[in-house]
Swiss-Prot record:
Keywords: Amino-acid biosynthesis, Cytoplasm, Isomerase, Lysine biosynthesis. The lineage of its organism: Bacteria, Pseudomonadati, Pseudomonadota, Gammaproteobacteria, Enterobacterales. NCBIfam families: DapF. It comes from Serratia proteamaculans (strain 568). The gene is dapF. The keyword Cytoplasm applies. This is Diaminopimelate epimerase.
Length: 274
């Protein structure tokens, strides 16, 4: 099986073309491939499939390192767009894809950045899903004997965003896994720790569902900005500084889609016998 290794700001992926190859990934195989000592090693596996709708170009599937399939990965979406052009699967600059839960448009810019229309953030607890009696801008939660205030949003996948004074000293290792598997998140969640530098600049660390803390999380950056704008703490355009690099997020507010722009890097191509 041929594959490519790619990353978006250090969030690394194994990308596989299932348009021209016949492939099947069991959870066990994905876990074996994800092992950084015994396999290829990655945060997520991205699979390019033929479209289910003639109006679309591809179907985009995402699997975490633990073998679970998820509906959204923003950094992966940028790498997906770069991959299909590099491999000659399309020469379009605006690439329309379906995911497990919806549709996306991935646009490759002249300077080889990728702008992703992530759709409109959804704060409805039932959609996230998040157990709450009504929609709030801020929720109070108990985790690891701490009381935390957080915002909750779906970017096609569930996110919980906490505001912290300093991302360097944030209790990511303590609170991340506890909140990820909290009973109020029936499908688990990605946990963002956001430090607001100014209305146009935040620093962010993300503990990803099924992967742990990563160098960058695109949908997590989108979620943090969406929550910050909802809470009237951030402007419409925000520079998001992650451990692996920076993203530009733009959202005009309710009724509008959110856009994420950033790089996608091809590292190497490989072949593995399964």
């Amino acid at each position: 099986m041929q594959f490519s290794k790619m990353h978006g700001l250090g969030n690394d992926f194994m990308v596989v073309d299932a348009v021209t190859q016949n492939v099947y990934f069991s959870p066990e195989l994905i876990r074996r491939l994800a092992d950084r000592h015994l396999g290829v090693g990655f945060d997520q596996l991205l699979v390019v499939e033929p479209p289910y709708d003639p109006e679309l170009d591809f179907h985009y599937r995402i699997f975490n390192a633990d073998g679970s399939e998820v509906a959204q990965c923003g950094n992966g979406a940028r790498c997906f767009a770069r991959f299909v052009r590099l491999k000659g699967l399309t020469n379009k600059r605006d690439i329309r894809v379906s995911t497990q839960t919806g549709r996306m448009v991935l646009s490759v810019t002249d300077d080889d950045l990728v702008c992703v229309n992530m759709g409109e953030p959804n704060f409805d607890p039932q959609t996230v899903p998040f157990r709450a009696t009504k929609e709030e801008k801020t929720y109070i939660m108990r985790a690891a004997e701490h009381t935390v205030l957080c915002g909750v949003v779906s970017m096609g996948n569930p996110h919980c965003v906490l505001q912290v004074d300093d991302v360097k000293t944030a209790k990511v290792e303590l609170l991340g896994p506890v909140l990820e598997g909290h009973e109020r998140f029936p499908e688990r969640a990605n946990i963002g720790f956001m430090q607001i530098v100014s209305r146009e600049h935040i620093k962010l660390r993300v503990y990803e569902r099924g992967a742990g803390e990563t160098q960058a999380c695109g949908s997590g950056a989108c979620a943090a900005v969406a929550v910050g704008i909802q809470q009237e703490l951030l402007s419409e355009e925000v520079h998001v500084e992650l451990p692996g690099g920076s993203l530009h997020i733009r959202w005009k507010g309710p009724g509008s889609p959110l856009f994420m722009t950033g790089p996608a890097t091809h590292v190497y191509d490989g072949f593995i016998h399964l």
